[in-house]
Every structure is written in C-alpha cells, then in structure tokens.
A protein has these predicted regions:
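Conserved ABC ATPase "signature" region
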Residues: 63-64, 111-129
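A short, proline-enriched helix->beta-strand linker immediately N-terminal to the Walker B motif
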Residues: 153-157
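Conserved ABC transporter NBD signature motif
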Residues: 56-64
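Helix N-cap at the start of a conserved alpha-helix in ABC-type nucleotide-binding domains
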Residues: 170-172
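Catalytic Walker B motif of ABC-type/P-loop ATPase nucleotide-binding domains
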Residues: 159-162
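Conserved ABC ATPase signature
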Residues: 134-138, 142
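Helix-to-loop junction immediately C-terminal to a conserved catalytic motif
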Residues: 48
Length: 176
C-alpha cells in the first residue's frame, strides 16, 4: 500500500501540490484525474521519488520514501515501473535495449534471460518486430508501447503510468 500524507510541493513560490493525501491499495487500479496543469505529473514524480515534497510523507508499506537514503530508494525502485508522459526512450538505444535497461540495472539474471524477458514484454505490446529499431525510426504510438514494455519489464509491484493512452489509437489503447 502507498500512503501519501499531507504532501506539499512548490516551485519558485507557486504551490503545485497543497496538502495532498491519498491511499493507493495494493492490487487495485488507482487513478489520478485532473485537468491539464493541475499537478498530476508532479504528484507522480513525488510518489516515485524523482522529486521530493517540501513537506509530508510518502509511505510504501509503512516505509517513508522521503527519508530514504539513495541505497534504500534504489531498492524500492526495483519494485516500480514508470511510464512517462512522453515515453522517455533513450535515442541511442534500440527498442530492445530500452526495454532491457531496467533489467540491466536491477536484475541479476543472465543476459540471455534478461533479453528473453524484454522480448516477452515487447510481444505483450505487439512490438517484437521493432526490437532492432531506434526510437527515431518508429511512430509515436510505437514509442509509447516500447515505453510500456520497459515499464513492465521488471514485473513491478507498483506501476505508475502518466497519460498511458496518449498517442495510441483506440484499438491499441484497449489492448494496453
């Protein structure tokens, strides 16, 4: 379970998150809904530890993310998958290498097993045929699917998706 307790975040005197609290139950789909510019992305970045709130707590099964050192935060990140709004693929890596990136960072499996897992994830999003292509060689929708494959590569306990359906056609959105 993730508990967000009274977090506040400001940038240059402008408050983006003001005393936000929420509980996200394990095993359930939780949605953060709001209009453009309302702070949804900032909230997600705080929840995953890419930003630190000015005040408040973010608890993962009782462990406070805001007080974790770098090593503890890296251990927690092994349990997370993140789909960023703009896909955030590495331009210098192939689609397969992008999906393998979190596996290479956090998995102790053999290279062959990491590659097999990455291909499985690409197959899940119907993108196995693009494994050797670079992000500049694929469409926006294909980039989004590659980013989804990367987000699920570690079979994360927590999966965070920022605008998961943007750039996808309706049929692919249903598949995802």
């Amino acid at each position: 379970m993730i508990e967000v307790k009274n977090i506040t975040k400001s940038f240059e005197g402008r408050t983006v998150l003001n005393d936000i609290s929420a509980v996200f139950e394990t095993g359930k789909t939780n949605l953060i809904i709001g209009r453009s510019g309302s702070g949804k992305t900032v909230l997600i970045k705080n929840i995953i530890g890419l930003m630190k709130p000015d005040s408040g707590e973010i608890l993962y099964d009782g462990r406070d993310l805001t007080s974790m050192d770098k090593q503890e935060l890296n251990m927690l990140r092994r349990e997370m998958g993140m789909l960023f709004q703009g896909s955030a693929l590495f331009d210098s890596m192939t689609v397969l290498e992008n999906v393998m990136f979190p596996l290479n960072m956090f998995s102790k499996e053999s290279y062959k097993d990491r590659e097999k897992r990455a291909m499985f994830c690409l197959e899940r999003v119907n993108l196995a045929e693009a494994e050797h292509l670079y992000p500049s060689e694929i469409s926006g929708g294909m980039m989004k699917r590659a980013a989804i494959a990367r987000a699920i590569a570690l079979n994360p306990k927590y999966l965070f998706c920022d605008e998961p359906n943007s750039g996808l056609d309706p049929k692919t959105s249903l598949l995802i």
